[in-house]
């Protein structure tokens, strides 16, 4: 089982640093999402099926093995955004893809990329549908809606320097939908999702860059 895990395919996130023109950034992000869902996901699902077959062949009788076999049954048909591991609540793909963005400081982005994760330690993760290529939103407005959506952790300007793009898993729950006011005075809806604090685990990042 351990040797199988060594061959788990990892997606190489698209590096969009430094950010180019907004229209180019938009196209690059959409292309990265398409590559993940249309190319990489097939390779990943094939791996998960092979891993599941290995688990089903194990004869060990224990609660731990029961949980692993339940996970294996899920992963035969459902994309998981982290390698197969002993968890009762895996980060599975939703029935309908939800593309979201997590804003963070340069230092934090570097750390999560090194750890191939989306968290630093055990912390909640706030994600939003606000795209990083939107040039009509002021930094202060971005700060306002982020802090209103999740007041448990106050964000500062440096926390908006960078972004990572991901598919939200089934563990991301809808938090709120707020209105942001753009530079032209028009109100636009933006949605926030939160993934509650959990043990740190790997998670596939689709793209990353500066804002």
Curated annotation (Swiss-Prot):
Assigned EC number: 3.1.3.48
For this protein, what reaction is catalysed? O-phospho-L-tyrosyl-[protein] + H2O = L-tyrosyl-[protein] + phosphate
Give the keywords, sorted: Hydrolase, Protein phosphatase
Pfam families reported in the protein's UniProt record: RolB_RolC (PF02027)
> In the UniProt record, does the keyword Secreted occur?
no
Family under the similarity heading: Belongs to the rolB/rolC family.
Task: Describe the function of this protein.
Answer: Induces differentiation and growth of neoplastic roots (hairy roots). Seems to function as a tyrosine phosphatase.
| Name of the molecule in the record | Protein-tyrosine phosphatase rolB
- What is the originating organism of this protein? Nicotiana glauca
């Amino acid at each position: 089982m351990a040797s199988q895990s060594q061959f788990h395919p990892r997606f190489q996130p698209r590096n969009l640093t430094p950010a180019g023109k907004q229209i180019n950034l938009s196209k690059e992000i959409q292309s990265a999402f398409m590559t993940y869902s249309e190319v990489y996901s097939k390779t990943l699902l094939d791996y998960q099926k092979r891993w599941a077959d290995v688990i089903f062949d194990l004869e060990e009788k224990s609660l731990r093995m029961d949980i692993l076999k339940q996970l294996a049954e899920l992963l035969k048909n459902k994309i998981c955004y982290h390698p197969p591991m002993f968890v009762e609540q895996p980060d599975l793909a939703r029935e309908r893809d939800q593309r979201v963005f997590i804003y963070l400081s340069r230092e934090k982005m570097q750390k999560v990329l090194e750890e191939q994760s989306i968290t630093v330690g055990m912390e909640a993760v706030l994600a939003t549908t606000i795209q990083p290529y939107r040039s009509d939103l002021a930094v202060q407005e971005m700060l306002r809606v982020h802090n209103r959506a999740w007041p448990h952790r106050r964000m500062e300007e440096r926390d908006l320097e960078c972004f990572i793009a991901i598919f939200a898993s089934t563990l991301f729950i809808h938090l709120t939908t707020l209105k942001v006011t753009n530079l032209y005075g028009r109100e636009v809806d933006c949605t926030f999702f939160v993934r509650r604090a959990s043990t740190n685990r790997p998670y596939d990042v689709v793209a990353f860059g500066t804002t």
